[in-house]
């Protein structure tokens, strides 16, 4: 970052902060090496968002890095096409040699998928994504792809139950960017709602599949990923040895 500023540390080019920086890479490698000496096998996870050439080098050195797919998955869950291709959530699509990409659909910085499903979801005849039951089914749909793409994942709190309060939800029920960091309702009662519980179990089944002895190698080692995420009809096949999964 300092390399984009003038000699006084001012007039910085914020847009240049993500450009590949070899000095930054060296610093991170030093941190990683020290951690592995002190705690062998420890995970190092970066909220980095640098140029892909830098992230490739860090990923191949053992780091895991966040990958923001909020817009892509939300476009898919709402049933709209402009940004619904989530191919960049596949580590091989970025040229990475290891599945160290931690993709996420939601985070502390991103809008809740269910909020936008219910507010802006597509409608076709009787099929209405703005209705709770259908919106939750759309979350099962995107979850099927999200959890079966190899690599670690991040799930934001209550996403597994279809939490629909906006990131900008205010205590009085209104929506404002001024309320972004305000406390949000804690809805443990969602587990007793059948459609929300169905989503919970659908996501749990996908996660359990990742730990199944028959399929675990698909998510933890070099594998062949063929897919087409560009159109309305999406599919993916992951193969490792004799094991394979197909998601449609």
Regions found by a protein language model. Give the residues of each.
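Short, basic, glycine/proline-bearing loop/turn elements
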Residues: 113-132
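Active-site-proximal helices and loops of the catalytic beta/alpha 8
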Residues: 2-110, 126-127, 135-136, 144-153, ...
């Amino acid at each position: 970052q300092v390399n984009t500023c003038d000699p006084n540390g001012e007039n910085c080019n914020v847009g240049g902060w993500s450009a590949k920086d070899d000095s930054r890479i060296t610093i991170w490698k030093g941190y990683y090496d020290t951690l592995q000496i002190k705690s062998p096998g420890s995970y190092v996870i970066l909220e980095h968002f640098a140029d892909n050439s830098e992230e490739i080098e860090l990923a191949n050195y053992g780091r895991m890095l966040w990958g923001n797919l909020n817009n892509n998955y939300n476009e898919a869950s709402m049933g709209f096409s402009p940004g619904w291709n989530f191919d960049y959530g596949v580590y091989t699509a970025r040229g990475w040699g290891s599945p160290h990409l931690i993709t996420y659909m939601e985070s502390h910085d991103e809008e809740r998928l269910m909020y936008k499903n219910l507010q802006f979801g597509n409608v076709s005849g009787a099929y209405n994504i703005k209705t709770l039951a259908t919106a939750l089914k759309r979350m099962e749909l995107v979850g099927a792809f999200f959890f079966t793409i190899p690599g670690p994942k991040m799930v934001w709190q209550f996403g597994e139950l279809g939490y629909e309060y906006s990131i900008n939800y205010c205590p009085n029920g209104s929506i404002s960017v001024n309320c972004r960091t305000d406390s949000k309702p804690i809805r443990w009662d969602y587990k007793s709602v059948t459609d929300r519980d169905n989503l919970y179990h659908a996501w749990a089944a996908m996660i359990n599949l990742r730990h199944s002895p028959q399929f675990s190698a698909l998510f933890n080692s070099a594998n062949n990923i063929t897919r087409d995420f560009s159109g309305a009809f999406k599919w993916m096949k992951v193969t490792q040895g004799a094991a394979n999964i197909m998601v449609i």
